[in-house]
Amino acid sequence: MTNCLSFRNGRGLALLCALLGTLCETGSGQIRYSVSEELDKGSFVGNIANDLGLEPRELAERGVRIVSRGRTQLFSLNPQSGSLVTAERIDREELCAQIPLCLVKFNILVEDKLKIFEVEIEIKDINDNAPNFPTEELEIKIGELTVPGTRFPLKTAFDPDVGINSLQNYKLSPNDYFSLAVNSVSEGAKYPELVLERALDREKREIHQLVLVASDGGDPVHSGNLHIQVIVLDANDNPPMFTQPEYRVSVWENVPVGTRLLTVNATDPDEGFNAQVSYILDKMPGKIAEIFHLNSVSGEVSILKSLDYEDAMFYEIKIEAQDGPGLLSRAKILVTVLDVNDNAPEITITSLTSSVPEEGTVGREIALIDVHDRDSGQNGQVEVFVLGNLPFKLEKSVDQYYRLVTATSLDREQISEYNISLRASDGGSPPLSTETHITLHVIDINDNPPTFPHLSYSAYIPENNPRGASIFSVTAQDPDSNNNARITYALTEDTLQGAPLSSFVSINSNTGVLYALRSFDYEQFRDLKLLVTASDSGNPPLSSNVSLNLFVLDQNDNAPEILYPALPTDGSTGVELAPRSAEPGYLVTKVVAVDRDSGQNAWLSYRLLKASEPGLFSVGLHTGEVRTARALLDRDALKQSLVVAVQDHGQPPLSATVTLTVAVADRIPDILADLGSLEPSAKPNDSDLTLYLVVAVAAVSCVFLALVIVLLAHRLRRWHKSRLLQASGGGLASTPGSHFVGVDGVRAFLQTYSHEVSLTADSRKSHLIFPQPNYADTLISQESCEKSEPLLITQDLLEMKGDSNLLQQAPPNTDWRFSQAQRPGTSGSQNGDDTGTWPNNQFDTEMLQAMILASASEAADGSSTLGGGAGTMGLSARYGPQFTLQHVPDYRQNVYIPGSNATLTNAAGKRDGKAPAGGNGNKKKSGKKEKK
């Protein structure tokens, strides 16, 4: 490819078209251009983008740049046009001197591909220099006796241009005595000589003025002038003569300054002044006069300045020998500089990738290095290698370029940074070497998932923990770095008891600390199985799981719960039955309690906290069985009150209490008969207090009785067909009816309004007792164990109701019994015609539910001695081995209304007032008492 460029010089050249840009591919990746010297900065050299197969914009994108080994940049890249341009004005004479072919070599690096292209540019000479003589004037002395035809050497002109632009011819100004002869040598140099054509006559003309013109072959032609002054002397017919026209000498570049190279010698056969020879170093352009010294007297040539083979390997020195009158002769000295290994190799990092990803492919380019040694021959032969056992190697590229590539895969987790040392050694003796160091960072890729130090974890947290409490901390390790090692924690979604697991436990995504979102209850669940996921922040992210078993530790947060006797909901008190004939160790009842805690916190112990008759009963420490501690005596009260405490073994221990009422009698009718005559014993010192209590209770009783009357009237209106109180009529309107219902199917005396009525025929006072609830939840509640004082209702109060017959009590209907078929059973089938007017829907249902609960709770207990006989009414039959609902007698057979002639029957035919056939039960009881 040829480019025609134009330029202007200072003298007004219009246009010079020359062959400038011949581009060719020489070998692999070699580009060649040609350009003229003295072009302006930025002048076009060649379309480098097109020759590289790139678009102009890709020069910057792909990192295309010039590599010139530290020399002055003569050329640059224009990223806009994609062309190679001059970086400054180029002077071929300064760059290449007299070398005919001036070549500038450099390399172009394509950064992203780490590819090198060799570029060679030929600098074309232009005729920018005129021939120039060393001096402007030359004085020649010629004897008048000089024979015509004698030749006198003249100063040669020097033109730094080459080729046709260099010195081409000499021309002497016209004269009558002298002519010009030009001698050409093999190197192409031309030496002018002044030829004497006619004999001189000093007497006619002593001085001759001549002009020697040196011209080049350029267009336009440049020339230089030398003014010659010829002085006619007396006769000196022999010039000095060198022993040899050319001297050759070789010298090592490292010789010291002042070293003598050689001595030249010239002789003159004349005598006297005409034979005195002096040596002159011809004035030559360049730095020869600064490097070499010629002794004008001895002809000794020595070194003034250190030689450097790398700067110049050859010197040509021109010398002259002149006698006294001025005759001279010429010779030249050829100095060859010998190379020594005085330069260590140079390592230049042309391109460098400071970081590479780990686990990359083998052969990944890291750096492009240029290795150069300024020495020559074996001294310039360089070998470069990587020091140490590192996973890198060097591959030869073009010229003296090497590529540093990976030899194996890199693993950042093993080595994250490499300090690569490169050593270049030449082949000299001794060899010289140079080292350079490259720091390479290995970029992490996400090739390692987070790992936990353990396969699974176990954590423990006590129940009733505060919300937000820290439970446990898990930590995973990731050998990667930065985001690839930034770990986040999460819980795998799951459900627990129908609720999402995230509502129970949360985890801090950054620290791995688990927190409780709610207060745990050991009684609800005892352990949680969690799956913790640790994920890094790489792309794509990697994760791993670990199982965490969270165990809830039991705390003593539940007090014992008493199942039997169940705490009543209507304020009544249950009664347990103990026969007076019971022997020591007789099982009266059993307190059954459970604790929702576990372990030692649920280990229960029972003890008798308080008893109305100390020493009469005992409680099993671990069984809760209430047994008689001794035989029952006549002096023992009919009604015994016991407070039993149930305590667990937690820290601190929790407890609950229950109040038991034990009736000492063989049968329920005996209890009913005895309760009517019981008078609460008052302490002597409590008379005043009793009076105050009677007055207070009397006031409350009035309000209470009024309410009872209203309620009873309402019920009588609804149950007007009931024959429960037919015989008594309205006589008991002022007294609330009592219902003997067992709680849990066992307790015999459960009064709806929680009071007891005792009416006697021979007393003017009736006793109305309002007992307090006799159970408590904790040991602190002890007031329930105290016996309430009775409230006396006077006869006057009863007379206000207008019926004095209420004080006359009819004997109880002892024949009020139910046949076996009429008693309630599990099937609930009774003859509707035989059931009297007693309401049975509500109470039978309650009785059935209570007995089912009791049967389920205690059916397995076979140690009881109580049975379901007629004397005990089956109140404690739950401790029997065959307790069923059929063993429970009808509670209505033992109910009567004190102070009333009315009796409850289950048949319409038994209302004639006659004593029933089975009315001897009370007589038998009286007989037993008399015997005692």
Swiss-Prot record:
Gene Ontology MF: a single term: calcium ion binding
Sequence ranges on the Cytoplasmic membrane side: 714-932
Chain positions covered by the region annotation Disordered: 806-841, 902-932
Compartment(s): Cell membrane
Transmembrane segments: 693-713
GO cellular component: plasma membrane
PROSITE patterns listed in its UniProt record: CADHERIN_1, CADHERIN_2
Name of the featured protein: Protocadherin gamma-A3
Originating organism: Pan troglodytes (Chimpanzee)
Lineage: Eukaryota, Metazoa, Chordata, Craniata, Vertebrata
